Amino acid sequence: AAKNDLKAYVMNYNNPGSGNTPKIPMSDADYNSLYQSVQLQFFPGEKMIYLTTAFSNTYNYFTSAQAKRLILLVSLESNRLQLAKLSYRSITDRNNFNILYDMFTSQASKNDLEAYVKAYKD
């Protein structure tokens, strides 16, 4: 399977519009660099800008665990909810996305995210 994944990736690398490009999560080195950059931001608004940009970039993909760890750098629950929704597009292991739900103390936030995920269309 890994060989086929690699072959598909290589074949689609120069043809991103094909729709078959595999979603490969960000490398550990790139992820750690991003995490440290966000962590160094003092103001919450700056963290939101960094994370919004990272999750909006169509070339960035994350595992659920990577996304959760990044989102936990933001303390306000409404911002976490916004980022969790934004990150869903870029998640490579959506079957594990449920690990993000425990970031929320409010059941309303959990319900809101669940409704978003159920209605999401690629």
What positions do the PLM features span?
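General marker for long, soluble alpha-helical cores
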Residues: 1-122
